[in-house]
From Swiss-Prot:
GO MF annotation terms: NADH dehydrogenase activity; oxidoreductase activity, acting on NAD(P)H, quinone or similar compound as acceptor; quinone binding
Subunit structure: NDH-1 is composed of 13 different subunits. Subunits NuoA, H, J, K, L, M, N constitute the membrane sector of the complex.
Substrates-to-products reaction catalysed: a quinone + NADH + 5 H(+)(in) = a quinol + NAD(+) + 4 H(+)(out)
Organism: Pseudomonas fluorescens (strain Pf0-1)
NCBIfam families listed in its UniProt record: PRK06076.1-1, PRK06076.1-2
Protein name: NADH-quinone oxidoreductase subunit H
Lineage top rank: taxon: Bacteria
Family: Belongs to the complex I subunit 1 family.
Bilayer disposition of the protein: Multi-pass membrane protein
Location in or out of the cell: Cell inner membrane
The encoding gene: nuoH
GO biological process annotation, one example: aerobic respiration
Length: 335
């Protein structure tokens, strides 16, 4: 009797895929910080990082070395266990959420029938990480930043979920691969669910606390917010986690609204990974462009925008989608 049964081999291959994908996401998140700084320098007509290596390409390695050798300091009056746990939860929740993304027809960590619900469960965990960081730091700026972040995230996650319910109503499934295959046979959801796409994209920027929704860490008001007391590798986990969040939301936008790994009109299906990577890179660049071009609004304006504009628009989109699906569904006679 051998240990290497087909079931065991499938488990081993799944674990290998998970390790490769998650390591690639972490490396991409670290590299994205360099890409953002270079693009911001280009768009703002100035030099970006250009001292370390050719074209500054080794700047990220220098930053990582500096971060690694910095003192791993913990405030004396902080709750040390929760203070240490917060960055671990923040980064782990984002990496685990990435497990549901089908990158190609054969590459993906988990094919869950509750894929979308799993994503929202992991997104909810990130709220706890921010609260842990703010409360355990024993710093008023950190606490205020964490309260802002939790209120903003919870508010925008409400209609983030409602924005995707129109897709679920049309497909009849929470499975990510089912959603991608439905788009291959029909229109990409960017067309029938355009308003759902707009509200989901806005919510994605807000949930990742990216500019212009970076109120929880507004330097002018809160002195860097909930991670003001963090240094060294703990701060680095928050820093890289933010870029992993950008990659996650961009990959979700591609999967849910732009056909996933499929090219436009089914062109070159053998280049599934290339299509997925190109579309994801486009949205990552859009995240960076928002930082370079839009001013930061006041916090009350951010919250009013979510409840008074985005939520009604999302509800109208969901109701119209449900009405159209019911209208096109043939009636079933009751025996």
């Amino acid at each position: 009797m051998t240990w290497f049964t087909p079931e065991v081999i499938d488990v081993i291959l799944t674990v290998i895929k998970a390790i490769v994908i998650l390591l690639a996401v972490v490396v991409a998140g670290a590299l994205l910080s360099f890409v953002e700084r270079r693009l911001l320098g280009w768009w703002q007509d100035r030099y970006g990082p250009n001292r370390v290596g050719p074209f500054g390409m080794f700047q990220i390695a220098a930053d990582m070395l500096k971060m690694f050798f910095k003192e791993d300091w913990t405030p004396p009056f902080a709750d040390k266990v929760i203070f240490t746990l917060a960055p671990v939860v923040a980064m782990s929740a984002l990496l685990i959420a990435f497990a549901i993304i089908p990158i190609t027809p054969t590459w993906g960590v988990a094919d869950l029938n509750i894929g979308l619900l799993f994503f929202f469960a992991m997104a909810g965990l990130s709220v706890y990480a921010v609260l842990f960081a703010g409360w355990s730091s024993n710093n008023k700026f950190a606490l205020l930043g964490s309260l802002r972040a939790s209120a903003q995230t919870v508010s925008y996650e409400v209609f983030m979920g409602l924005a995707l319910m129109g897709i679920v109503v049309q497909v009849g499934s929470f499975n990510m691969r089912d959603i991608v295959e439905y788009q291959a046979q029909n229109l990409w959801f960017i067309i029938p669910q355009f308003f759902g796409f707009c509200t989901f994209f806005i919510a994605g920027v807000a949930v990742t606390h990216r500019h212009p929704f970076d109120q929880p860490e507004a330097e002018q008001e809160l002195a860097d917010g909930y991670h003001i007391e963090y240094a060294g590798m703990k701060w680095g986990m928050f820093f890289v986690g933010e870029y992993i969040g950008i990659i996650l939301i961009s990959a979700l936008l591609v999967t849910l609204f732009f056909g996933g790994w499929h090219g436009p009109f089914g062109i070159l299906p053998q280049l599934s990974f290339v299509w997925f990577a190109l579309k994801t890179a486009f949205f990552i660049l859009l995240f960076i462009l928002l930082r370079a071009s839009i001013p930061r609004p006041r916090y009350d304006q951010v919250m009013d925008f979510s409840w008074k504009f985005c939520l009604p628009l999302t509800l109208i989109n969901l109701l119209v989608t449900a009405a159209i699906v019911l209208w096109n569904t043939p009636a079933v006679a009751v025996q």
